[in-house]
Amino acid sequence: MDHKMSMYLFVSYLAIFTLFFKGFVSSFPSGYNNGYNNGHGHGLTSNLNYRFYDRSCPRLQTIVKSGVWRAFKDDSRIAASLLRLHFHDCFVNGCDGSILLNDSEDFKGEKNAQPNRNSVRGFEVIEDIKSDIESSCPLTVSCADIVALAAREAVVLTGGPFWPVPLGRRDSLTASEQAANTNLPSPFEALENITAKFVTLGLDLKDVVVLSGAHTIGFAQCFVIKHRLFNFKGSGQPDPNLAASSALLSKLKDTCPNVDSSDSKLAALDAASSVKFDNAYYVNLMNNIGLLDSDQTLMTDPTAAALVKSYSENPYLFSRDFAVSMVKMGNIGVMTGSDGVIRGKCGFPG
């Protein structure tokens, strides 16, 4: 390939990337501080900025990426865990790293709340990344920002979209087991209740549908789904929708036999591609084989069902909207400036 042709291809690729990036940025709400202007936006937006650590910790994103990659090589399921960790952090008093705090004399933390106990994981991965960052940039980067970046890297590693993460969050000094029990959606909840919890935090029904798509790489403990396998609505029979797919039902029953000892075993929410971030979750919902009650209930609302159909048919649309909703979620209740602290270790407030 001669020099002129190489330059032509380079310019063409650059133009395509520029058009894509402009389209991605324009997807954010009007007034959003996208890091290329000085506005602070409105609603969920804040004083976060994509370039917050460019001078104070220039290797930050490389360190986080390396830490997530090391963990992923040993355990591919950690990708889903890191993504869930960010969600569970943000939904309890904001994206402040509170989920990472151990219990203390002053408070009972979120780790042992009902939705998190023996379920949420990835704490050691975040702590290891924090240790590496402290070696380069002592007391500079918040644990809350590390969680947000790790969630993004987890999605990218499994084939999902990349999105710029606004940074500058500060860490909380406390955590609340009670708030976690109250604020986090349950897999058994009705769509109306789940949506109400999202709306309280400034999100909406579309965000419910989009962020539920994270279940494409998710897992559930067997006790959450066994009623659909063996005794749906007290019938003593499987859910007819799952029974219609005999191969899937058989596989799920093998994974989650009808004995108490299987309650803590794990079943993939997207069995066909459990380590690939794709739109198969929505295809499953269209086929009435979403495993969680809170998943399949999306099809009971016309607006939500229409979004599910769109995402099942258009993976690019899902990827774009997922990135936008993740940034929205990552702005919930953030502390910036002199509020909060920068923890030296993520499990301890001081």
From Swiss-Prot:
Disulfide bonds join C57-C137, C90-C95, C143-C346, C222-C256. The active site is at H88. The keyword Disulfide bond applies. Keywords: Calcium, Disulfide bond, Glycoprotein, Heme, Hydrogen peroxide, Iron, Metal-binding, Oxidoreductase, Peroxidase, Secreted, Signal. Heme b binds at H215. SUPFAM superfamilies: Heme-dependent peroxidases. It comes from the Eukaryota. Its EC number is 1.11.1.7. Ca(2+) 2 binds at T216, D270, S273, D278. The record marks R84 as: Transition state stabilizer. Expressed in the whole plant, with the highest expression in roots. This is Peroxidase 10. It comes from Arabidopsis thaliana. The gene is PER10.
